[in-house]
From Swiss-Prot:
Keyword Membrane attached: yes
Motif mapping: SCOOP motif 2: 75-89
GO MF: LRR domain binding; receptor serine/threonine kinase binding
Keywords: Apoplast, Cell membrane, Cleavage on pair of basic residues, Membrane, Secreted, Signal
GO cellular component, one term: plasma membrane
Record's signal peptide: 1-29
Residue positions of motif SxS motif essential for MIK2 binding: 59-61, 81-83
Superkingdom per UniProt: Eukaryota
Region (Disordered): 50-92
Tissue: Mostly expressed in seedlings shoots and roots, and, to a lower extent, in leaves.
Compartments in which it is found: Cell membrane; Secreted, Extracellular space, Apoplast
Quaternary assembly: Interacts with MIK2 (via extracellular leucine-rich repeat domain); this interaction triggers the formation of complex between MIK2 and the BAK1/SERK3 and SERK4 coreceptors, and subsequent BAK1 activation by phosphorylation.
Protein name per the record: Serine rich endogenous peptide 11
Length: 92
């Protein structure tokens, strides 16, 4: 009886060890190497353009507005609202 429980415990331990080794090997292979990180960093930096503005529209706007295409709400002529809920200027 003792021999049977010893063998089942050792089999369970062996399976646990194999699973642990497999997990560690898979995790390590999923991480990029140092050389791959350097190449990726250089590739990302090649897209970087230090003399350009990010997210600003061009100054030649087809909308005919201001120089940069942005208008404040105070500059817009809203007019009267057709819903009667306000939002326009009262014209008395």
């Amino acid at each position: 009886m003792e021999n049977n429980t010893f063998s089942s415990k050792s089999i369970n331990l062996l399976i646990l060890l194999l699973l642990l080794c497999t997990f560690l090997c898979q995790t390590e292979s999923a991480l990029p190497s140092h050389q791959e990180l350097v190449i990726t960093g250089r590739r990302m930096m090649s897209y970087y353009k230090p003399n350009t503005d990010i997210g600003t529209p061009s100054s030649t706007s087809d909308r005919g507005g201001g120089g940069n295409g942005r208008r404040l709400m105070s500059q817009m002529d809203v007019g009267a609202s057709s819903s009667g809920q306000g939002g326009g200027r009262n014209r008395h």
